[in-house]
């Protein structure tokens, strides 16, 4: 039929299939059906995997039916040209592989920022960047506390070796201040009145917090030292008053005991003297010594009389 009318689809041969530009398909199953325009129909099915050549053969003239074999117009419509496939496919594959490698190689961290009253979620590939992206206004107090703690640690490490001498110096200063206050306390009131230049004075400014205490020589003292001196003076006064009261009570007790003992001795003497006066005959004597002598002589005479009567 194609031969009579001069048009139609020629029978395609297997040799022409190898010349097709199918490099973009690779190894695939091919189902090809070829029809002729005559009464007889040549149908064949080819299933299998064929290595498609990447080189397109030149079209050639076949004497059978007078057709030029090559890539037909329909093949060009259904199959894209070779150059485009060779250029586009590798680029697309490379891009996909590069993206997959980047996604697999990257590690992302979830960082929860709970500083302050807010909670924020940060997603970053680097943990350092996530901390750098924290809000500056959310944790200024934390940074200040960390800086202060670092400074305190540095100061403490530096003071470990020199802590004892500093304490000794402080104790010496306190002792010196206490001794100076004791010496000033023992001064008499007349000396304080006459020496007006050396007397301590208190200067009070407009604010209560800015009070300064001037010492005996006009040297300003801090509020802490002033409080220490005041407390020490009060304690010394209390001690002196307590000691004075104790001494006074002891002295008064001794005096009373002495007086009582003296009174008791005098009373006993007066009682004995009165008894002797009543015993001794004769005139009443005023001097107690004479009364005692007369009483002794009288007792001796009575003893002699008693012996004579027994004899």
Curated annotation (Swiss-Prot):
<comment type="subunit">
    <text>Homodimer.</text>
</comment>
<dbReference type="GO" id="GO:0046983">
    <property type="term" value="F:protein dimerization activity"/>
</dbReference>
<keyword id="KW-0804">Transcription</keyword>
<dbReference type="InterPro" id="IPR037546">
    <property type="entry name" value="SAC51-like"/>
</dbReference>
<dbReference type="GO" id="GO:0006355">
    <property type="term" value="P:regulation of DNA-templated transcription"/>
</dbReference>
<protein>
    <recommendedName>
        <fullName>Transcription factor bHLH145</fullName>
    </recommendedName>
</protein>
<keyword id="KW-0238">DNA-binding</keyword>
<dbReference type="GO" id="GO:0003677">
    <property type="term" value="F:DNA binding"/>
</dbReference>
<keyword id="KW-0539">Nucleus</keyword>
<feature type="domain" description="bHLH">
    <location>
        <begin position="253"/>
        <end position="302"/>
    </location>
</feature>
<dbReference type="InterPro" id="IPR011598">
    <property type="entry name" value="bHLH_dom"/>
</dbReference>
<dbReference type="GO" id="GO:0005634">
    <property type="term" value="C:nucleus"/>
</dbReference>
<keyword id="KW-0805">Transcription regulation</keyword>
<dbReference type="Pfam" id="PF23173">
    <property type="entry name" value="bHLH_SAC51"/>
</dbReference>
<dbReference type="GO" id="GO:0003700">
    <property type="term" value="F:DNA-binding transcription factor activity"/>
</dbReference>
């Amino acid at each position: 039929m194609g031969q009579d009318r001069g048009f139609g689809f020629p029978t395609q041969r297997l040799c022409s299939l190898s010349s097709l530009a199918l490099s973009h398909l690779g190894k695939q199953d091919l189902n090809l059906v070829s029809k002729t325009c005559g009464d007889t129909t040549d149908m064949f099915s080819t299933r299998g995997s064929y290595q498609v050549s990447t080189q397109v053969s030149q079209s050639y003239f076949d004497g059978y039916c007078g057709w030029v074999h090559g890539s037909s117009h329909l093949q060009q419509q259904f199959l894209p040209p070779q150059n485009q496939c060779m250029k586009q496919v590798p680029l697309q594959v490379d891009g996909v592989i590069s993206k997959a490698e980047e996604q697999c190689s990257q590690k992302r961290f979830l960082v929860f920022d709970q500083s302050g009253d807010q909670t924020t979620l940060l997603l970053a590939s680097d943990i350092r960047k996530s901390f750098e992206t924290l809000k500056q206004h959310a944790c200024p107090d934390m940074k200040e506390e960390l800086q202060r703690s670092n400074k305190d640690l540095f100061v403490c490490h530096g003071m470990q070796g020199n802590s004892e001498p500093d304490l000794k110096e402080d104790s010496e200063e306190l002792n010196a201040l206490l001794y100076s206050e004791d010496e000033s306390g023992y001064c008499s009131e007349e000396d304080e009145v006459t020496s007006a230049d050396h007397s301590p004075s208190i200067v009070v400014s407009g604010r209560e917090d800015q009070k300064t205490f001037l010492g005996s020589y006009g040297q300003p003292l801090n509020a802490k030292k002033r409080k220490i001196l005041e407390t020490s003076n009060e304690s010394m006064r209390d001690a002196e008053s307590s000691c004075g009261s104790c001494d006074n009570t002891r002295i008064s007790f001794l005096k009373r005991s002495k007086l009582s003992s003296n009174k008791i001795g005098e009373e006993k003497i007066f009682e004995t003297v009165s008894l002797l006066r009543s015993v001794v005959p004769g005139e009443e004597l005023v001097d107690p010594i004479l009364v005692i002598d007369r009483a002794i002589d009288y007792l001796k005479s009575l003893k002699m009389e008693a012996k004579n009567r027994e004899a």
